Amino acid sequence: EWGVVKAVRSKGIFVMMDIQALKKIEISPHLIACHVRRYLDTLDLLALTIEGVSAYAAAHIAQNEIEEAISDINRCWNEDHLYMLTPSFLLNLIVKHTGDGSLNAVYTLLRQNLGIGRSIPALCKTEKTAEDYELYEQCITALNQLYAGRQEDFSNRTAKVFRYIYDYVTEKCKNLGYYDSAMAVYDGSALWK
């Protein structure tokens, strides 16, 4: 059960707000705009680059690592609130095999930033959605393709997974009213001038 508690030393833990009260809190989009923008930029960069990076990593991933990733995904899929980590296990496996250079440094940061999404209000639900089932199936399919030695299929599927996440999250941020505030954090077009 979700809520807010206050711990007072030597007195105990007191419930300050239950789940119903938490749902009534409205957070202004500009207060979280930087976090939303960083998350969207992370997803965008992953969607743009993951196909080549996963193709490179695929050649170095051992069968037992694939089995472990599948096992981790299946374990978390059946635990409340952990099912959202499914794409993280796929990304973790890839990051482990990006070498020691700048690519690894960038992808390690992207992996860390992927967790931002879990802290954005109303972006994640406690119940599994059709999109969650789709992501689960796609991640497992990608890993099974890699396990079968089909590295190109693995990298193509992985690219589709992260493009799907980017498109889904972008649309959800627009529906929640976060997108415009996030895009106003800085002028992204200046990067290409």
PLM features per residue range, with description:
Residues E1-L48, G52:
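Short linear motifs at protein or domain termini
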Residues V4, H81, R150-Q151:
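Residue-level recognition of short, well-ordered coil/turn positions
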